[in-house]
Amino acid sequence: MIAIVDYGMGNLRSVEKGFLKVGVDARIVTDAASIDNADGVVLPGVGAFMDCIKNLSDMKLTEAIIKSIQKGKPYLGICLGLQVLFTESEEFGVCRGLNVFKGKVVRFPKMDLKVPHMGWNTLNIKKMPPIFNGIGGESYFYFVHSFYVAPEDEG
């Protein structure tokens, strides 16, 4: 069973429907025990970094998520669900993350680009991860975001 973590924000139903459509047993969960017992974890994300961290902490889910990752269970962080794995975010001042990965979540620099970044774009992938097996290298993905992760180790 894949645990889709409901921490009070996020696009839960669309993620759940996606898994069900491809025949994967995925359930929306709100407790640490369900995360511990799951074969993998999905943390969907829509909203502010600080609110996400506060909700995960208030619901006592942070430790279960970190332990699941440390055990090597598959983890899919969608947008904010990826960002909270990093050391900190500069959104609305500095806010500590789960520190699974060393690095920061930073706002796109002021340039001639529109922020938030919205629309269909390709990816510039340095090392192809297994999740992209069967997806063409020039595939398009939809984005709606104002921040990106800047890992300390880009490997």
Model-derived regions, located:
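An anion/phosphate-binding loop that grips the pyrophosphate of nucleotide cofactors and donors
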Residues: 38
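Structural motif
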Residues: 42-44
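Structural alpha-helical scaffold elements that stabilize or flank donor/cofactor-binding regions
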Residues: 34-35, 68
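Pocket-forming structural segment of enzyme catalytic cores
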Residues: 89-155
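Short glycine-aspartate micro-motif
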Residues: 4, 75-77, 141
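Cysteine-nucleophile active-site neighborhood
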Residues: 47-119
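N-terminal beta1-alpha1 ligand-phosphate binding loop
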Residues: 2-24
